[in-house]
Amino acid sequence: KIVESYRKLYNIMGMNLRSVNIGCNSIARIVLADKSNMEKMPLLVCQIDKNFLGLTLFENGQMAFARYVPISEEDYDSDDYITEALNENIFRMEQFNKARGGSGLENVILYGFIEDYIKLVDALDGLDIKASVLGVPAQITGFENFEFTVFANAIGALYKRNKATEKINLLEVDQSTGKGGSSGMGSL
């Protein structure tokens, strides 16, 4: 339905649409560039912020699912609402993984706004997972001058896209309408 809506929009605009690509988000580029993460899958990568959590599940060497969860202090009966929200959402993502036939989560990588890493890891201890902080890629220099995990998404966006693994052309896979290919005026 969405693909067809874009087809109509581009047709109205009189534009020749050759492809609509979706792919990995910027943090996925950093995670997948580190080959040691392949051994940790299924792997959950969690972005922590005072207002949201970003959760990205990796399975079989690729990004499988991502969700963004707004959080606020009012939603939890605790001053430590970030830790509570993180615990709750890691548990949900583990249930999601298991519901799809997965083995459950053993490894979680954290990045973003991490005030007290030890406190956070201790709080996650009840989930029986190994938590770590997103490592700085070898090609990143000068990270001593800033907190890498806070800027990881922006840095990941600078990585060159791997066209072989990070491309899904929605025009080629639009099976719901029976339309495919990349020709035609204003098609999506």
Regions found by a protein language model. Give the residues of each.
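Hydrophobic/aromatic-enriched cytosolic interaction surfaces used to assemble or bind macromolecules
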Residues: 1-188
